[in-house]
């Protein structure tokens, strides 16, 4: 679940949401992707609406990996046969930025 986004995800939390899981299985059945992809959607009144599907690793891959799923290794090994892998639910990621200056003034 993306909590805050401005181009790149600023804050997110891992959650298992059955309606999203079913939607993603339907996307896989329809498009038969080979490799990683991410789905961007919004949920309104309990209904998910997809607005983007990206054939790449998500910018939140660090959260995925910290939650226990090494998506890069799975892609390289081609060992994943389908199904939802176990992951740590409720894990929160927050990004922050700062300005660094160096060199002559």
Predicted features along the sequence, with ranges:
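Protein kinase-like catalytic core scaffold
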Residues: 49-52
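A short glycine-rich, hydrophobically flanked beta-strand micro-motif that places a catalytic Asp/Glu
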Residues: 34-45
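Peripheral (often C-terminal) accessory segments that flank ATP-dependent C-N-forming ligase machineries
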Residues: 44, 73-105
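ATP-dependent carboxylate/phosphate-activation module, predominantly the ATP-grasp catalytic core
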Residues: 1-32, 54-77
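Short beta-strand element of the conserved SAM-dependent methyltransferase core
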Residues: 1-2, 14, 41, 98-103
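Residue-level preference for alpha-helix termini and adjacent loops
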Residues: 36, 56, 62, 66, ...
């Amino acid at each position: 679940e993306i909590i805050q986004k401005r181009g790149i995800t600023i804050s997110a939390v891992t959650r298992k949401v059955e309606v999203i899981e079913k939607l993603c299985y339907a996307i896989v059945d329809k498009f038969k992707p080979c490799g990683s992809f991410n789905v961007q959607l919004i949920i309104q009144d309990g209904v998910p609406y997809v607005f983007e599907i990206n054939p790449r690793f998500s910018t939140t891959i660090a959260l995925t990996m910290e939650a226990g799923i090494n998506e890069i290794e799975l892609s390289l090994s081609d060992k994943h046969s389908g199904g939802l892998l176990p992951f740590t639910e409720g894990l929160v990621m927050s990004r922050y930025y700062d300005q660094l200056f160096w060199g002559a003034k």
